[in-house]
Curated annotation (Swiss-Prot):
Gene designation: addA
The protein, known as: ATP-dependent helicase/nuclease subunit A
GO biological process: double-strand break repair via homologous recombination
Function of the molecule: The heterodimer acts as both an ATP-dependent DNA helicase and an ATP-dependent, dual-direction single-stranded exonuclease. Recognizes the chi site generating a DNA molecule suitable for the initiation of homologous recombination. The AddA nuclease domain is required for chi fragment generation; this subunit has the helicase and 3' -> 5' nuclease activities.
High-level lineage: Bacteria, Bacillati, Bacillota, Clostridia, Eubacteriales
Cofactor: Mg(2+)
Subunit structure, interactors included: Heterodimer of AddA and AddB/RexB.
Family assignment from sequence similarity: Belongs to the helicase family. AddA subfamily.
Tagged with keyword Nucleotide-binding: yes
Catalytic activity: Couples ATP hydrolysis with the unwinding of duplex DNA by translocating in the 3'-5' direction; ATP + H2O = ADP + phosphate + H(+)
Length: 1279
């Protein structure tokens, strides 16, 4: 029936029968089309047609289920067009509405509703709102803790003392998190108790035989492979270098030792050999012909290996059996108490839900599981009678996105599928055993396997929701591609989405970095994507672009000091990356004069110009980055929309309405009250609010308003107010003097507020909120503002939330406000209302997770230099599905706490799993692109980063696993892979590192690497403005046609003021500006002279994280200004002077840490310091101003035109002192010194103007000029 030309592999996936079939479908492989076609072939099979309601099709989302139904419906309708009399087609079309195409949760709900009587649940149950559930959980845990405190439960008290800190909230958080975590296990009580029992070890316990020991060994072997590479590399250098062959033997011994460790199978032998090995000493031979550079290089590599082996030895020493046993025994009571606490909490929470006839989202799967499972006499988990009925009913069970299944879902699907076997616990883990089970009655036909599972483990990115990619991987490794067997797999790796350039680039990168260790799968040629899409020859594909920006931007100490900014504050790095992306987009889209990228339109069947809607910017997380990118793109006139999950509660309209609700509930809250008073709802101005506060500064603001209201209305004040009013005459005078209009405003607001408070009691919260919208006119006001449609949509969401809340068991305004507060913090805020349609011509910014399943002509992946989020590893108790609990060891009696041995193991395991998840997330991001892929990222120090990348490039085929394992950003993975690619040659040459790489990879993928820096991005803005003006002039002239005035118009529009440069010359310059200008003249003339100033956020708006270079310089200069040279004979004297500055509040204690007494003492004891001490005339921090000709600074100016232009040069001379022959000028520098000549050149012009200033001011000659360099404890003379 289908006209689609299927590949051989797709046909196998569509037509293979009578087996459990696993379809591994790579990105863009058309798995949905294959799944739909398989269903169509099943229901339209001429020999054995299957009614569509006899198929269970489980999808990941409701949208996917709806799309599948629609596709199947279209196929049936098309068949009816060809054969209108077909009874089979008509029947299937009728049955389509009854089809079981749904999400796993929809199926579970169906099972519960059809079998509610078996689990004693009210048939009228309701699924509780997420936040309603949170409120009930909080109630339950508060009540539980109170009860346990009351009965003084000893285990609970010990648990509190060990893990609760000062407040219970920390332990409550642990219980709630563990409860959520346990609910993703099929039988959560069993799992909780089993995990606690892992700590219940006896005298026979032997740590060396536990799974934890094997895990330590395997993790360490990954590192050892890295050490092996380093030693092998060293041996190659030794054998190919002159005069260091005597190093060969000790290096070879080390390599043999590493190889021996890698072969060890038992932890005991592995541990013993590492602890016993003694590194041979290197021979101390001297050979004048030896290659010193090579010798030093191999020594450094060996020292690095030795250091790491010693660290491993220390770690392994800590895993001594008796010590480990004692630790387990000590932790057992706490872990058992924790498991029991979670179970008690769950029972209390369950009771609260049952009281209200509620179930929550987790209950849906667990209740279904309890209906579908039973236990046999041996305790094995087998299908219930109800499950067996489902097995009879469903001819096939088809599961989409199988890689994202969790263990609960896997057990449920195994109960309704025709699989032979049972589930049971083994060493605390639930495992499936593929064996025959004895059922009470035979079930004919149920022995034919009927599971169809499709997915791509490389796109499993939901581990944070407890997805278990191992479920897919286990089958992938066990199933065979052989025909005619019961467990079979088919691979669909032909990509019908992307251009060859995208596919080749993705394949190259992931062959280099994805492995079983990180990614949980070896990305081999067999796993690689194959080109399946055709884009014709009309437009050639483009290389993948890697745009790197160096965060390091050389700004001297003087400039930092002058503007009082930190390097990081000079311009926000996210902002700069956003600007970089904006420039790439402008180039891609093009303009009227120059065409941009052409993309193929599938609907039109031809190429067209790229539009904004064709571009997506993907980020790992959007909360902090997306708003900055939106701002930067909007500045460039690029339409953009960010699909985020945050920011809703920060919008002005929602803040105002929540504040209004808060003061209606309780007006004695100053901050929300002032927010409402200053809003258009009340329209008080600042002066009016000050007048109100003058009534009394010690009471709530509302009480001030209440006093004014009562006295103005001649009402008597009650005793409460009388207590605060000591002088009623004074208050009456304040009110009498108060503006009549203000008094009326106060009375009007108080009366309205009282009416609203009364009304809030009598109507439902959703009605009340809508009443407030209309009553205050705020809904209309919000709509009249800029982005009014968006604001009104946000207000409607608040109304909808209130409507949901009104249906819960909680009532009242107070509880609704709590509900909203819980929503803020429990759900991590929400995104603003979505008002954009699919066809809006805007750039979209979204998280990688939200992009899964989508595709775009152009993908820009940004933020690749951002660190992975590993904050969860810092919690005091870690949880792992297979390994259980990883607690801190806390001994309250001895007051000691440290990570337990098992916590360190689990921490490392979670870290590796997190990195594997990040690897797969990167894969998802890069495979969204159809035609063009751009990757952008920031790097702290480009030279250092590239040097480290080059050190990892020995293996052409793979970035070393240990390097991938130590990666902290996506660029840490991408960089080492790309630096050795043939297309990176020019990039390496630009960084003067082309000679350092011998292993160039000649891969068919195409890459374009661009290096950007901050200065370029700042400079280009001004240049673009000038080009834009020029282009507008050209456009205007073109539109004139054949006008007689064309030449005159061009002349006028192009006119430049003769003295235009003079308008840009400042009247005053600092010496630092002058110095900077002269440096620029040598490099780039005066390109920065007339540049626009980039506005930055004030310091008080940013969080101060560290003392900046400018602050450090200022602090040291301040100390040198106040240093008493006569009392600086030793370090103690200097420390005393530092403390005196702290006492006088010149500096803080934190700031004082940058002053090194030893360095100050070295200055005092230097020859220059002694000369200064011996002088009778010392002057410090002397400000000056001198006038000089402008052409002396701006040498490119026409001297005839600008000969009379003058500039004022200002500055502060650090120090000068007088000797018999003249003055000695001294300037302190705290810059890092790399090259003495460079420092001299940098500050020569500055010192020149200091000298001239001293000559003019004192009338005396400057005999010597010095820079004192604190970084190297030395001084240099300036000639």
């Amino acid at each position: 029936m289908s006209s689609t030309k299927w590949t051989d592999e797709q046909r196998q996936a569509i037509f293979t029968k009578n087996c459990n079939l696993l379809v591994a479908a790579g990105a863009g492989a058309g798995k949905t089309a294959v799944l739909v076609q398989r269903i169509i072939e099943k229901i339209l099979d001429k020999e054995e047609p299957i009614d569509i309601d006899k198929l269970l099709v489980v999808t990941f989302t409701n949208a996917a289920a709806a799309e599948m139904r629609e596709r199947i419906g279209d196929a049936i309708s098309k068949g009816l067009d060809e054969d209108p009399e077909s009874k089979v087609l008509r029947k299937q079309l009728t049955l389509l509405n009854k089809s079981n195409i749904m999400t796993i949760h929809s199926f579970c709900l169906q099972v519960i509703k059809n079998n509610f009587h078996t689990i004693e649940i009210d048939p009228n149950f309701r699924i509780c709102d997420e936040t309603e559930g949170i409120l009930m959980k909080q109630e339950a845990i508060d009540e539980l803790f109170d009860e346990l405190y009351e009965i003084e439960n000893e285990d609970f008290i010990n648990l509190v003392e060990s893990y609760a800190s000062r407040k219970d909230i920390r332990l409550q958080g642990v219980v709630l998190e563990l409860h959520r975590f346990a609910k993703s296990a099929p039988f959560s009580y069993d799992w909780l108790l089993n995990m606690a029992e892992e700590f219940n070890v006896g005298e026979e316990f032997n740590f060396e035989e536990t799974p934890w020991a094997d895990m330590i060994m395997e993790d360490m072997k990954v590192l050892l492979h890295g050490f092996k590479n380093m030693l092998q590399k060293s041996i190659d250098v030794i054998l190919n270098s002159e005069g260091i062959e005597y190093y060969y033997e000790p290096f070879k011994m080390d390599l043999n030792f590493i190889n021996s460790l890698l072969e060890k199978l038992s932890f005991k032998e592995f541990r013993g050999e590492i602890i016993a090995y003694d590194f041979p000493k290197l021979p101390l031979k001297r050979n004048k012909d030896a290659d010193k550079e090579a010798k030093e290089r191999v020594k450094k590599l060996r020292d690095k290996v030795k250091k790491r082996i010693i660290e491993l030895r220390i770690t392994l020493n800590s895993y001594e059996n008796e010590f480990t046993k004692k630790e387990f025994i000590f932790l057992y009571p706490s872990m058992k108490a924790l498991s029991n606490l979670v179970i008690l909490f769950d029972k209390k929470y369950e009771a609260k839900k049952r009281e209200r006839d509620l179930i929550d989202f987790n209950d849906i799967e667990h209740l279904c599981l309890s209906i579908l499972t039973d236990k046999d006499s041996k305790g094995h988990i087998i299908p219930s009678d109800i499950a067996l009925d489902y097995r009879k009913k469903f001819a096939e069970v088809l599961i989409d996105e199988y890689q994202d299944s969790n263990l609960v879902q896997e057990v449920i699907m195994s109960m309704v599928s025709r699989v032979k076997g049972y589930w049971s616990f083994y060493n605390g883990q639930l495992m499936f055993n593929e064996e025959e089970i004895n059922l009470e009655e035979p079930h004919i036909g149920l022995d034919i396997p009927n599971r169809f599972m499709v997915g791509d483990v490389k796109q499993s990115i939901y581990r944070f929701r407890q997805a278990k990619p191992e479920i897919f991987l286990d089958k992938y490794n066990e199933y065979s591609e052989e025909e005619g067997i019961k467990n079979r797999k088919v691979k669909l790796f032909k990509n019908f989405r992307s251009r060859e350039e995208v596919i080749n680039g993705v394949n190259y990168l992931f062959k280099q970095i994805m492995s079983k260790t990180i990614g949980e799968l070896d990305y081999t040629e067999e796993e690689a994507l194959k080109v399946g899409a055709s884009y014709g020859e009309e437009v050639k594909g483009e290389p993948i672009e890697l745009c790197l920006m160096d965060k390091k931007y050389e700004i001297s100490e003087e400039v930092l000091k002058e503007y009082n900014v930190d390097e990081e504050e000079a311009l926000d790095n996210i902002q700069l990356e956003g600007r970089l992306v904006a420039k790439k987009i402008q180039k891609l889209v093009g303009n009227n004069l120059e065409g941009g990228l052409k993309v193929f339109d599938k609907k039109l069947g031809e190429y067209r110009n790229l539009q904004y809607r064709d571009i997506v910017i993907l980020m790992r997380a959007t909360s902090n980055w997306a708003p900055v990118f939106v701002e930067e793109l909007a500045k460039e006139g690029i339409p953009v929309f960010a699909d985020t999950n945050s920011g809703y509660f920060d919008t002005a309209e929602i803040k105002t309405m929540i504040s209004l609700l808060q003061i209606i509930d309780n007006p004695l809250q100053d901050i929300p009250l002032l927010s409402v008073l200053r809003s258009p709802i009340a329209s008080f101005n600042d002066d009016e609010l000050i007048d109100i506060r003058m009534v009394n500064k010690n009471i709530a603001f509302y009480e001030c308003m209440e006093i004014i209201y009562r006295l103005y209305k001649n009402e008597k004040l009650d005793s409460y107010y009388s207590f605060y009013i000591k002088d009623e005459n004074k208050i009456n005078k304040i009110i009498k003097d108060m503006n009549e209009k203000l008094k009326n405003k106060i009375c009007s607001f108080i009366e309205k507020l009282k009416l609203w408070r009364e009304k809030s009691i009598n109507i439902d919260i959703d009605e009340f909120i809508w009443f407030l919208y209309m009553e205050t006119g705020y809904y209309g006001y919000a709509g009249a503002l800029q982005a009014g449609e968006q604001r009104q949509a946000n207000l409607r969401i608040l109304f909808q939330r209130a409507k949901q809340y009104a249906k819960t068991s909680y009532k009242g305004l107070f509880n609704f406000i709590n509900f909203i507060n819980k929503l803020k913090f429990s759900s991590g805020d929400m995104g603003s209302a979505k008002i954009l349609g699919e066809n809006e011509n805007v750039i979209r910014i979204m998280s990688i997770h939200k992009s899964k399943g989508l595709e775009f002509p152009v993908v820009i992946l940004s933020g690749t230099g951002k660190n992975f989020n590993m904050t969860d590893l810092n919690k005091n108790i870690l949880f792992h599905r297979d390994l259980g609990y990883g607690p801190d060891y806390v001994d309250t009696e001895r007051r000691i706490a440290y990570p337990s041995l098992v916590k360190n193991i689990i921490k490392n395991k979670i870290r590796l799993e997190t990195l594997s998840e990040e690897m797969r997330i990167l894969y998802v991001a890069l495979t969204r692109a159809r035609e063009k892929l751009i990757i952008t990222g920031l790097i702290n120090n480009m030279d250092k980063a590239v040097e480290s990348w080059l050190n990892l490039s020995d293996d052409k085929n793979k970035v070393p696993e240990y390097a991938v394992m130590n990666g902290k950003t996506y660029l840490d993975w991408i960089g080492p892979a790309i630096i050795k690619h043939k297309d990176a040659v020019s990039f390496r040459e630009e960084l003067k590192m082309s000679s350092e790489l011998s292993n160039i990879v000649d891969d068919k993928s195409k890459w374009k690497i661009e290096l950007w820096n901050k200065k370029e991005l700042l400079k280009e803005k001004v240049e673009e403005d000038e080009v834009e003006i020029s282009e507008k002039i050209k456009e205007t002239l073109m539109n004139l046609g054949e006008s007689n005035y064309k030449e005159e118009i061009y002349k006028r529009l192009s006119f430049k003021y003769k003295y235009d440069n003079a308008s840009s010359i400042p009247t005053k310059l600092s010496v630092s500006d002058v110095k900077k200008q002269f440096i620029l003249d040598e490099k780039e003339n005066t390109e920065e002279l007339f540049k626009k100033v980039e506005l930055r956020k004030p310091m008080f708006m940013g969080e101060k994280k560290k003392i900046s270079p400018s602050e450090r310089g200022t602090i040291i200069h301040l100390f040198m200004q106040h240093l008493d040279l006569k009392k600086a004979e030793n370090k103690e004297d200097i420390k005393e002077q530092i403390n005196r500055l702290i006492e006088r509040e010149f500096i803080t204690y934190e700031q004082s840490k940058v002053i090194n007494p030893y360095k100050i003492l070295k200055f005092c004891r230097s020859e220059l310091g002694k000369r200064m001490i011996n002088s009778n005339n010392i002057n410090r921090e002397m400000p000056f101003s001198i006038e000089i000709p402008a052409v002396e600074i701006y040498r490119e100016l026409d001297k005839n035109i600008y000969k009379d232009e003058k500039l004022i040069i200002q500055g502060i001379i650090d120090c000068y002192f007088e000797e018999e022959e003249g003055l000695v000028l001294l300037d302190y520098k705290t810059d890092y010194v790399n090259d003495i000549e460079e420092i001299k050149n940098r500050y020569e012009i500055q010192i020149k103007y200091y000298e001239e200033a001293l000559n003019r001011i004192t009338g005396k000659t400057v005999k010597d000029k010095y820079l004192y360099l604190f970084s190297v404890d030395n001084y240099i003379k300036i000639d």
